[in-house]
From Swiss-Prot:
Belongs to the UPF0102 family. Coiled coil: none annotated. It holds the Pfam family UPF0102. HAMAP family: UPF0102 (MF_00048). It comes from the Bacteria. This is UPF0102 protein BVU_1879. InterPro entries: Restrct_endonuc-II-like, tRNA_endonuc-like_dom_sf, UPF0102_YraN-like. GO terms for molecular function: nucleic acid binding.
Length: 121
């Protein structure tokens, strides 16, 4: 596995541990359906939380959350729709971003709740 993939996986591990520590129940990690993918799907206070995880070694080229572009948001929304249909989930949905910055653990973690809303097409 490429070094950047290992680094990203380490960040996702830390993000999941952070969420569990905060009382979230992890439903799925790296959920795939065809080309659709969600980093973390969790439940918290009767909501389904879809979390996009971004890990960076530093912020020299911008903040990690800036990598969640409109195109990426559309993919996350489409993936969430597939997830809701597959598992017949009937909960309100919230979209969060967790950023992790640092060379290795402990990372600096930022949890951005309600980071974006589904666009109206």
């Amino acid at each position: 596995m490429a070094e950047h993939n290992e680094f990203g996986k380490e960040g996702e591990e830390e993000a999941a541990a952070y969420l569990i520590d905060k009382g979230y129940s992890i439903r799925h990690r790296n959920w795939h359906c065809g080309k659709k993918e969600l980093d973390i799907v969790a439940e918290y206070r009767n909501e389904l939380i879809v979390i996009e995880v971004k890990t960076r070694k530093n912020t020299r080229f911008g903040n990690p959350e800036d990598a969640v572009t409109d195109k990426k948001i559309r993919r996350i929304i489409a993936s969430t729709d597939a997830y809701l249909r597959k598992f017949s989930v009937d909960l309100p949905v919230r979209f969060d971003i967790i950023t992790l910055v640092g060379e290795k653990t402990p990372f600096t973690i930022e949890h951005i709740e309600e980071a974006f809303y589904p666009p109206i097409w």
